[in-house]
Curated annotation (Swiss-Prot):
Heterododecamer (2C3:3R2) of six catalytic PyrB chains organized as two trimers (C3), and six regulatory PyrI chains organized as three dimers (R2). Catalyzes the condensation of carbamoyl phosphate and aspartate to form carbamoyl aspartate and inorganic phosphate, the committed step in the de novo pyrimidine nucleotide biosynthesis pathway. The keyword Nucleus does not apply. It comes from Pseudomonas fluorescens (strain ATCC BAA-477 / NRRL B-23932 / Pf-5). Belongs to the aspartate/ornithine carbamoyltransferase superfamily. ATCase family. Carbamoyl phosphate binds at R71, T72, R121, H151, Q154, G280, P281. GO terms for cellular component: cytosol. It catalyses: carbamoyl phosphate + L-aspartate = N-carbamoyl-L-aspartate + phosphate + H(+). InterPro entries: Asp/Orn_carbamoyltranf_P-bd, Asp/Orn_carbamoylTrfase, Asp/Orn_carbamoylTrfase_sf, Asp_carbamoyltransf, Asp_carbamoyltransf_Asp/Orn-bd. This is Aspartate carbamoyltransferase catalytic subunit.
Length: 334
């Protein structure tokens, strides 16, 4: 267990409800299932003529992204708007943070504007935990991705994708392929799959892109694509994160594709009804062949759709948990 994992009680209020969403570590199957069930119920909102429910009316959600993002930032904005929240998205490149203002000073200024929730993406592992410890406890913190550590909403939208296409987790074989070492998505997915009862979790990567101690996640490790993909139900491809790499981990992107790229021929070794997933952005011809990314096995665009519903679920549940905690503290202070 890492020091980051030891901080997991921060996420829950005294009634065991979600109040922050920082990591999937330490959250039990019942809570993860509640998130999935709540997200399922929100999917129909996207099909309405008026795509709104009033659950966060009068609340303010601030998106504070210190790393670039398209899908995550946009889907969080849409999720908050569909819950009727007021939404502020901070452009860090043009904010005072670019002039040397610290992370906490930036957030405390937003807190002083009566924000109710921060969605934070940051390049440092543990940033979301740090913020949850040091801002006003009445502000809910949602981790939009922190360094290599965690991307919990991506993990949950991947779980919703799998559940909706496969019905459950108890009899599945799932392969996670690519840059495991630098991937917060891989870590969140491994934790979620284990918690939800998936019996066969595989990781496939070159040895240089496997983290030390990965066996603690209860996964089977493969360094050969043909062997690792044999009879799997789900293939989750990961982007090569060159921006987090130091030299020498890979000879070239072409060599990686030759050995670990998902091609139609390699996918034939999986089950005939296998699904292919990718958190995006996709590097075609590096980790995945276009014919696979756009083919009948791909559910990549479904992931984006499900991501809005999952983020609606997390925002609404965390806000509800914060409200319940304030009421609990007020009652016990009397």
């Amino acid at each position: 267990m890492t020091p980051l994992d030891a901080k997991r009680p921060l996420q829950l209020n005294d009634q065991g409800q979600l109040r922050h969403f920082l990591s999937l570590d330490g959250l039990n199957r019942e809570l993860l299932t509640e998130i999935l069930d709540t997200a399922d119920s929100f999917l129909e909102v996207g099909a309405r003529a008026v795509k709104k429910v009033p659950l966060l009316r009068g609340k303010t959600v601030c998106n504070v992204f210190f790393e670039n993002s398209t899908r995550t930032r946009t889907t969080f904005e849409l999720a908050a708007q569909r819950l009727s929240a007021d939404v502020i998205t901070l452009n860090v490149s043009t904010s005072s943070a670019s002039k040397g203002e610290t992370l906490l000073d930036t957030l405390r200024n937003l807190e002083a504007m009566a924000a109710d929730m921060f969605v934070v993406r940051h390049g440092d592992s543990g940033a979301a935990h740090f913020i949850a410890e040091h801002v006003c406890p009445q502000v809910a913190i949602i981790n939009g991705g922190d360094g290599r550590h965690a991307h919990p909403t991506q993990g949950m939208l991947d779980m919703l994708t799998i559940r909706r296409h496969k019905g459950g987790f108890e009899n599945l074989s799932v392969a996670i392929v690519g840059d495991i070492l630098h991937s917060r998505v891989a870590r969140s997915n491994m934790l979620a799959l284990k918690t939800l009862g998936c019996p066969d979790i595989r990781v496939i990567a070159p040895k240089t892109l496997l983290p030390i101690g990965i066996e603690q996640y209860g996964v089977k490790v493969y360094t050969d694509m043909t062997e690792g993909l044999k009879d799997v139900d789900v293939v989750i491809m990961l982007r090569l994160q060159r921006e987090r790499m130091q030299g020498g981990l890979l000879p070239s992107e072409g060599e990686f594709y030759r050995l670990f790229g998902l091609t139609t021929a390699r996918l034939a070794g999986a089950k005939p009804d296998a699904i292919v997933m990718h958190p995006g952005p996709i590097n075609r011809g590096v980790e995945i062949e276009s014919a696979v990314a756009d083919g009948p096995h791909s559910v990549i665009l479904n992931q984006v759709t499900y991501g809005i519903a999952v983020r609606m679920a997390v925002l609404s549940m965390a806000m509800s948990g914060q409200t319940a905690q304030r009421q609990f503290e007020q009652e016990n202070a009397q």
